[in-house]
């Protein structure tokens, strides 16, 4: 069984994209999709250990919403 989870993190001034990505990669997640040249509103992960950026509102995306602070504690 994998330690990876279906989670989502909102991207904003308090939770910048580069910090969220740094923490996800520290936890072993790998990029799956694009992150550059777009207006990223959230980052989502899956139980396969992959993450990608999304421009949809976090309420639309499946997964548990966590904060950057919670991500750093994982």
Give short role names for the model-derived ranges.
Residues 1-74:
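Structural boundary micro-motifs
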């Amino acid at each position: 069984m994998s330690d990876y989870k279906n989670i989502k993190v909102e991207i904003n001034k308090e939770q910048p994209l580069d910090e969220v990505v740094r923490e996800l990669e520290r936890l072993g997640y790998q990029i799956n999709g694009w992150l550059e040249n777009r207006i990223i509103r959230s980052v989502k992960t899956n139980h396969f250990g992959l993450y990608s950026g999304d421009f949809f509102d976090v309420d639309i995306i499946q997964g548990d919403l966590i904060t950057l602070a919670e991500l750093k504690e994982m």
